[in-house]
Amino acid sequence: MRHYELMVILDPSLDERTVAPSLENFLNVIRNDGGSVEKVDVWGRRRLAYEIDKQAEGIYVVLDLNSEPASVKELDRQLNLNETVLRTKVLRRVVEPRKAARVARAAAKAKNRPEASV
C-alpha cells in the first residue's frame, strides 16, 4: 500500500453540503480494492488562478488515501470522466522519517564522542 494525496476541483454550481457524499461513490473504488481513505478535507469554494472550463471558482477537496497504484489510477480515471470535476491531481505522499529515531541516533553519536578538553 502506498500513501497518496488527491486534490479535486469541482464545479462551483454544486452544493457544498453534497460534495462529500457524492465523492463517496468514487471512493468505493479504493475501499473495494482493500485501500482506505484517511481523510476527506473539503476546503470549500475558492477562486481559481485561471479559468477552467469558463469557471472562475471551484470547490476544492483534498483526500488522503492508502491504496495500490492501480486503484488510484482507476479512481482518477473515473473522476476525470465526471462532468462536475474540473481538475484532479494525484500526488504520492512522502512519509516523513520519525523524528524520534533521528534524535536517538544523534544522542547515541554524541554519547560515543570523547569530550573535548578546554
Curated annotation (Swiss-Prot):
Record-linked InterPro entries: Ribosomal_bS6, Ribosomal_bS6_sf, Ribosomal_S6_plastid/chlpt, Transl_elong_EF1B/ribsomal_bS6
Superkingdom: Bacteria
GO biological process: translation
Keyword check for Metal-binding: no
Family that this chain belongs to: Belongs to the bacterial ribosomal protein bS6 family.
GO molecular function, a single term: structural constituent of ribosome
Protein name (record): Small ribosomal subunit protein bS6
Gene Ontology annotations for the cellular component aspect, listed alphabetically: cytoplasm; ribonucleoprotein complex; ribosome
The organism of origin for this protein: Saccharopolyspora erythraea (strain ATCC 11635 / DSM 40517 / JCM 4748 / NBRC 13426 / NCIMB 8594 / NRRL 2338)
Function: Binds together with bS18 to 16S ribosomal RNA.
Keyword set, alphabetical order: Ribonucleoprotein, Ribosomal protein, RNA-binding, rRNA-binding
CDD domains for the chain: bS6
